[in-house]
Amino acid sequence: AGYQPTPLVALNELSALFGVQKILVKDESRRFGLNAFKMLGGSYAIARLLCEKYHLDINDLSFETLKSSIKEKMTFATTTDGNHGRGVAWAARQLGQNAVIYMPKGSAQERVDAILRLGAECIVTDMNYDDTVRFTMQTAQKNGWEVVQDTAWEGYTKIPTWIMQGYATLAD
């Protein structure tokens, strides 16, 4: 899937200003052409979902094995106001699956277009973010879709935890 480690960049002027030996930042602007680390969370959570469904060990798994293990067409759904939805859409496309991304009212057309370019269905609701999250959950349950939401609530913590674990892979 085109993985490349992203570089560490030295901020020499800033380290001199603060009188420290070195300040390094991780440059995520080249991450799969998405310019954001957020895709790490959604893609990791989707991989974990698939590993759970197909009894695979995520610690000993190639992308090709994961993709070839999928036995049925799946749809991944989420609510976003930007980069998380792009990450879910990107991961679904890489795996040959569907993504339906809901966005709250007032979402920028540029962000909608970025999700559409990744092959996902993108629907802007007339609701605020929290209501859109609830709507996404209800719609996904009704349609048999997998929700990959980065927001946790009582009874829904496993996938948001996986998303956070995916963000942590940035340091690997």
Question: How does the language model describe each region?
Answer:
Residues 1-172:
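PLP-dependent amino-acid enzyme catalytic core
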